[in-house]
Amino acid sequence: MAAGVLTPTLTNNLFARPQGANDRINVALIGCRGMGWSDLSDALVRPEVRCVALCDIDRHVLEDRAAELERRTGIKPTLYADYRKVLERKDIDAVIIGTPDHWHCLMMVDSCAAGKDVYVEKPLANSIAECDAMVAFAEHYKRVVQVGQQQRSGLIWHEMKKYLDSGSLGRIAKVNVWANFSYASILNPVQDSTPPEGVDFNMWLGPAPWKPYNS
């Protein structure tokens, strides 16, 4: 997929022109927790990027994020519970998809079909078939799409790849990998319960098979 238009690692050449109203990049964030919010914060480092819409299935998250965004940028975004309403807006140039994985494919292809460029969080999708469809939509609609895969966009990683490919290190016989955190805590079972007020759990499930809510 083509390089994205949003992340701070993007070359400055793309924006090396006088800034006017038509030079603004209007962005919508779909999925306002965690990585989605982090991605938006990175995008807003660029003065030509402004967030005009937020979308989430949790009304409380929406309201909190909208208030924070207005404090930071002075712009009051329009709030949505259904991403399809976001894609109807002609003034939105690009979307950031920070939803759970099972939504990535449908939201990304719908965004491409609606004429939006896309930054979609990792993992790209849940199957090779979904990935194939996403690539096909990006190519058919000629959209700029980037996957939020860490250590892929920065120039330092491209230089490292070139260095490894050059053979300067010789034959690599062993690679050590480590992590400084553990996912063990998420293995603890949580009892099913009723979705809290303000959360549209059916919309959260979307294309996924039905299952009861738990926190």
Name what the model sees in each region:
Residues R46, A81, R152-S153, K211-Y213:
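Redox-cofactor-proximal catalytic regions of oxidoreductases
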Residues A53-C55, I96, A173-N176, L205:
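Residues embedded in well-ordered beta-strands within globular domains across many folds
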Residues Y183-I186, W210-S215:
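Pol beta-like nucleotidyltransferase catalytic core
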Residues M1-V120, N126-V144:
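N-terminal glycine-/serine-/threonine-rich beta1-alpha1-beta2 phosphate-ribose binding loop
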Residues I30, E121, W178, P207:
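Alpha/beta-hydrolase-fold catalytic nucleophile elbow
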Residues K85, G206-Y213:
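Glycine-rich, acidic and aromatic/proline-enriched surface loops and short helix-turn segments
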Residues D117, A125-M203:
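A contiguous active-site-proximal alpha/beta segment in oxidoreductase catalytic domains
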